[in-house]
Amino acid sequence: MSVKKKDLITLQDPEAKYPLPLIEKEQISHNTRRFRFGLPSPDHVLGLPVGNYVHLLAQINNELVIRAYTPVSSDDDQGFVDLIIKIYFKNVHPKYPEGGKMTQYLENMKIGDTILFRGPTGRLFYNEPGTLLIKANKTSEPEKKLVHHLGMIAGGTGITPMLQLIRHITKDTSDETRMSLLFANQTEEDILLRKELEEVATTHHKQFNLWYTLDRPPSDWKYSSGFVSADMIKEHLPPPGEDTLILVCGPPPLIQAAAHPSLEQLSYTKDMIFIY
């Protein structure tokens, strides 16, 4: 008897916890890693709707630590799930001398060690071209939003949910949804997934626009510098409109001090903004 497709979905129950083993680890930069976790069989997929994410759970120093991550792999990938994660080491940031609990835990995992996954989780679903389903909160019914142009503001590892959508939309030749990404980082070295983003921007130049801003740019930098501003949004993202949606993901200062006030200043209404 053939195995049903549904049986090959790893995340069968969003409330359950699934232990998955670390099968590969790649150093992307001095503080960023790609972690590959194995699924129950080589034929399994994760089972994550586009727009959703997973939680990782670990007992660290007698405390249950839970963090949300968007995989950079998709349900086209069988047998594994990939996460790209920035490690927050201790004694690097004066505000956080202890560093990140979960990211340092992941950094110290050995091949074969398992960690608990839970999901899918999320309020955003991208089911068909130009159509998003958005829940106001976890328990509410999703509302449909038709989108012609998606604007994206990402900071640091906040790029991963954007990449999930960018890949999905550009892969589907029938999907004509336009996308514009404003990607904020501290330094040029911090730009995650740059090669892939620039390849997409070249291959799908009519559909996808890419712009960067850096806190500490090099002298020959040709993009923007400083915090995300109203001027940057005005120049590089779609204007307010019924079929516009601006997605925002990144650290709290990016959202609270930069993106949100700037979008409000430019008259984007609540239904035109989605914050991960």
UniProtKB/Swiss-Prot annotation:
Q: What is its EC number?
A: 1.6.2.2
- Indicate what this protein is called per its UniProt record: NADH-cytochrome b5 reductase 2
State the similarity comment.
Answer: Belongs to the flavoprotein pyridine nucleotide cytochrome reductase family.
Swiss-Prot/TrEMBL catalytic activity = 2 Fe(III)-[cytochrome b5] + NADH = 2 Fe(II)-[cytochrome b5] + NAD(+) + H(+)
Q: Which organism is it from?
A: Mus musculus (Mouse)
List the keywords (alphabetical): Acetylation, FAD, Flavoprotein, Lipid biosynthesis, Lipid metabolism, NAD, Oxidoreductase, Phosphoprotein, Steroid biosynthesis, Steroid metabolism, Sterol biosynthesis, Sterol metabolism
- Residue ranges the record marks as coiled coil: none
Q: Which cofactor does it need?
A: FAD
Question: What residues does the FAD-binding FR-type domain cover?
Answer: 15-127
- GO BP term, pick one: sterol biosynthetic process
Report whether Plastid shows up as a keyword of the record: no
Query: Where FAD is bound, by residue?
Result: 107-137, 146-181
GO MF terms here are:
cytochrome-b5 reductase activity, acting on NAD(P)H
